[in-house]
């Protein structure tokens, strides 16, 4: 058992270092280099890298802004429980950018999951969405939250 844990730690070390280096590059404005480092991590399932690639596409950082790709990367990360990506998905549903229309029920759901996951800004976004919703929409959103929460956060 100890050998397995040690092996996992050794494998995770370089990935963590690559993620931190890519974040530093992104903060320094070298978006293309950051994206090149994020992509292999994201393709291997790293939720942080997936979320940050989503940010790059959503904001057009080093790439042409592409709402569909941003949403797809955010969704991959969101389904792994990444609170920042869940807020990103919530924002897309709230605004309706790249969609036929806003979907406040789904926005509420994703902001709630993000808040449960620890994103402090999600509660603020949730308050704003509630102001735009009917009670029937809020009730429907609560059902979705309970459904997703059950499999996304089984121990909470």
Which residues does each predicted region cover?
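Short helix-capping/linker turns of helical repeat alpha-solenoids
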Residues: 29-30, 43-47, 59-61, 66, ...
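N-terminal leader/linker segments that initiate helical-solenoid repeat arrays
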Residues: 16-36
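N-terminal signal peptide c-region/cleavage motif recognized by signal peptidases
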Residues: 12-14
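Sec-dependent signal peptide recognition
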Residues: 2-8
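Terminal, low-structured helical/coil segments at or just beyond the last alpha-helical repeat
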Residues: 121-156
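Hydrophobic face of amphipathic alpha-helices that form TPR/SEL1-like repeat modules
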Residues: 19-25, 40-41, 52-59, 63, ...
């Amino acid at each position: 058992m100890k050998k397995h844990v040690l092996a996992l730690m050794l494998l995770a070390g370089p990935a963590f270092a690559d993620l931190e280096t890519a974040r530093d590059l992104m903060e320094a404005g070298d978006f293309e280099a950051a994206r090149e480092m994020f992509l292999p991590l994201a393709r291997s399932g790293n939720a942080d890298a997936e979320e940050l690639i989503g940010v790059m596409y959503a904001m057009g950082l080093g790439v042409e802004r592409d709402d569909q790709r941003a949403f797809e990367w955010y969704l991959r990360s969101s389904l792994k429980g990444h609170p920042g990506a869940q807020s990103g998905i919530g924002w897309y549903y709230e605004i309706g950018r790249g969609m036929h229309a806003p979907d406040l029920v789904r926005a509420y759901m994703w902001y709630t999951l993000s808040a449960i996951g620890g994103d402090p800004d999600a509660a603020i976004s949730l308050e704003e969405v509630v102001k735009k919703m009917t009670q029937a929409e809020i009730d429907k959103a609560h059902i979705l939250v309970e459904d997703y929460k059950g499999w996304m956060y089984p121990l909470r």
